[in-house]
Amino acid sequence: MSIQQIIEQKIQKEFQPHFLAIENESHLHHSNRGSESHFKCVIVSADFKNIRKVQRHQRIYQLLNEELNHSIHALALHLFTPEEWKAQNETVPHSTKCAGIGR
């Protein structure tokens, strides 16, 4: 099972998201082809209601602790309640390019 599949499986089980997008962004960095080191996760879940943004991130870090310690170098998290997601027009945030790309 790929790292991306593991991330998706764990998040689905823990948060039952209304929307989930996991993007492998390793190709945007100095990573080898097929690498799974940099990910962007957009998670929309009612579980995030009444939880501060820092605490939301902490819950994801705790859930993916093993992967963060062994495989994942960078994890961009965009975490929303269904209401917050609707307020931002259900738009997936764009990622910035790695500062080292093209040097």
Swiss-Prot record:
Show the InterPro entries listed in the entry: BolA, BolA-like_sf, BolA/IbaG_stress_morph_reg
**MF-aspect GO terms:** DNA binding
Instruction: Write down any Gene Ontology CC term.
Output: cytosol
Alphabetically list the UniProt keywords: DNA-binding, Stress response, Transcription, Transcription regulation
Q: Which Pfam families match?
A: BolA
GO biological process, any: DNA-templated transcription
Function (record text): Transcriptional regulator that plays an important role in general stress response.
In the record, the note on similarity to other proteins reads: Belongs to the BolA/IbaG family.
Instruction: Give the protein name, as stated in the record.
Output: DNA-binding transcriptional regulator BolA
Gene of this entry: bolA
